[in-house]
């Protein structure tokens, strides 16, 4: 596998330099049941968000993160903040999937590579070398799960430049249209 910094298509990716999970506040301006709000949309807006600061200084946010994954990411980050060399032990002897992956493979990097527009979900790829296999493989994963594995393995995380640019354009367009504001 290529050098950590020099993987194929590195120029098409921005490295994540800082990361923080944001948890929703239980108070909101929408009623819990509203005829204008689709229940699946309501479910998504009450889920955590991962906010990533990228190497170019921009911010990339990814919503709809499962609560348990966001909490596990937060625990890994908090443990590292206290002591970078502290093992990420848990009182529970059972392994989570993210822990099992790093036990069975050398994780090189996680990359958020694409979006599936009809579902409005991102796709990630996890580059790793399974123990005893020697040959690199790439797994497509749910991005939040790939990020968790990368954090546990101290591997780098990247986001596709095209995804970041599309998100910026969408944000600019929403500002122009005063998205979310009501006329008074």
Residue ranges of predicted features:
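Divalent-cation
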Residues: 2-184
